C-alpha cells in the first residue's frame, strides 16, 4: 500500500514537472533571422503588470473619482493569494469591487490599505484581476504608487507590479467650511 502511494506521488510530480517544462521550452525560442530583430518571438515568463487609472470625471485633489487597478500576474502556473496594496490617502471598503463583485470585509485588511484575494488561480498568464475603488476622495496633489502581488505557489518570473497615478492640483483652493481665511 505504501509502495503504491509513493509511486503514484512520484508519477504525479513527474507529470507536473513535464507540464510546466514543456511550454517553457517550446515558447522560449529566440528569433535570430535578422540582426535588427533581437527580441524573443514569444515569452512565457513575462513580468507581472499593473495598470492604474483614474476613471472618474475629475483627476484633481479633493474631488470624488473612481480608480481602476488592473493586475495581470503573467505566470505559467500560480495558485494562492493575490494582494493589492494601496498608498497613503486611499482606502478600500465594501463598496469597492474586484472583477465586478463587491469586496467582502474578510478581503479588506490593514484598515483598508490592503485587499487580499484568498484563493486565486492563474494558468498560462490568463489571469486578470480588476480592483475598482468607487467614489474615492482624491488626496493632495502628487504621485501615488499602487502595488499588486501574487503571494503564492508560482512558476514564472516576477510576481509583483507597481503603477502610479498623478493627482492634479486644484486651480482654486477649497473654501473653508467656516467661511474664514
From Swiss-Prot:
The keyword Transcription regulation does not apply. The keyword Metal-binding does not apply. Changing residue 77 to D/K: Forms flat, unwrinkled biofilm. Loss of colony hydrophobicity. Residues 1-28 form the signal peptide. Keywords: Cell wall, Secreted, Signal. GO terms for cellular component: extracellular region. CDD domains: BslA_like. It is found in: Secreted; Secreted, Cell wall. Induction: Up-regulated by DegU and Spo0A. Repressed by AbrB. Changing residue 76 to K: Forms flat, unwrinkled biofilm. Biofilm retains nonwetting, hydrophobic nature. Disruption phenotype: Overall loss in complex colony architecture and lack of fruiting body-like structures. Disruption of the gene results in the loss of surface repellency and alters the biofilm surface microstructure. Pfam families: BslA. Forms polymers. Involved in biofilm formation. Self-polymerizes and forms a layer on the surface of biofilms that confers hydrophobicity to the biofilm. The layer is stable and capable of resistance to high mechanical force compression. Required for complex colony architecture. May function synergistically with exopolysaccharides and TasA amyloid fibers to facilitate the assembly of the biofilm matrix. Belongs to the BslA/BslB family. This is Biofilm-surface layer protein A. The lineage of its organism: Bacteria, Bacillati, Bacillota, Bacilli, Bacillales. The gene is bslA.
